[in-house]
Regions:
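ATP-dependent small-molecule kinase phosphotransfer cores
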Residues: 33-111
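Walker A (P-loop) phosphate-binding motif
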Residues: 1-26, 31-33
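Well-ordered beta-strand positions
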Residues: 27, 33, 130, 174-175
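Short, acidic/turn-prone active-site loops that include or flank metal/cofactor-
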Residues: 33-36, 137-139, 161, 183
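ATP-dependent NMP and nucleoside kinases share a basic, alpha-helical "lid"
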Residues: 100-108, 112-148
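An amphipathic alpha-helix signature
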Residues: 24, 46-50, 138-146, 153, ...
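Amphipathic alpha-helical segments that mediate coupling or scaffolding at interfaces
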Residues: 9, 52, 72, 90, ...
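Small-molecule kinase domains that catalyze NTP-dependent phosphoryl transfer to phosphate-bearing small molecules
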Residues: 126-127, 147, 151-199
Length: 199
């Protein structure tokens, strides 16, 4: 059974590609979803985050205020960069353990596993059989984030700037999916790439 990495910058359409791969029979291990689960109210990870960043990162019900954390870690100053490093140091060890557990479940079930991991270029893995990068022009990504997700343009640009560069993501790719077209064109590319990987 194969282990395939899937990554792409924010706004690139990685989630759509992930859904298409699931439709093709892949077991999806979603790092963002794992992070959300690990940061649920009262979890050990969230407790450590509060110790580092203060109770201002919590909503009234004790859940994580993601926008509050984003304001702290996605700025362009040195304090924001240090905060992002600290956040990753808290979240990533717990994430890695859960990712490995889910990969094993998928393989034990006889499925090829796709690790949907936005930070794959920043945190390379040597256990991948292939890596799919969903690529899009950064200005198109900003446009999608602002017009589809309702994000502030400055926030969108800061988030993109805090991710690996487009060039760094493309450098780790064994396969590239260009998501500048429509969903039908994307589906065709995903089917072709999946066939190449699993064929």
């Amino acid at each position: 059974m194969l282990l395939v990495g899937l990554t792409g910058g924010i706004g690139a359409g990685k989630s759509t590609v992930s859904e298409l791969l699931a439709d093709l029979g892949a077991c999806i291990v979603d790092a963002d979803e794992i992070a959300r689960q690990l940061q649920s109210a009262g979890s050990p990870v969230l407790v450590k985050m509060v110790e580092r960043f203060g109770e201002a990162i919590l909503n009234g019900d004790g859940s994580l205020n993601r926008a509050g954390v984003a304001e702290i870690v996605f700025g362009s100053d040195d304090a924001s960069k240090a905060a992002l490093k600290d956040l990753n140091g808290i979240v990533h060890p717990a994430m890695q353990a859960e990712i490995m557990r889910q990969i094993k479940l998928g393989h034990d079930g006889g499925q090829h596993v796709v690790l949907d991991f936005p930070l794959l270029a920043e945190n390379p893995r040597d256990d991948l059989d292939a890596t799919i990068v969903v690529d899009i022009d950064p200005e198109t990504a900003v446009d999608r984030l602002v017009n589809i997700r309702g994000m502030d343009e400055t926030d969108a640009r800061n988030r993109i700037a805090n991710q690996a560069s487009r060039e760094k993501r493309l450098a780790i790719a064994s396969h590239v999916v260009d998501n500048s077209g429509d969903v039908d064109a994307l589906r065709t590319q995903v089917e072709d790439v999946w066939g190449q990987i699993t064929g």
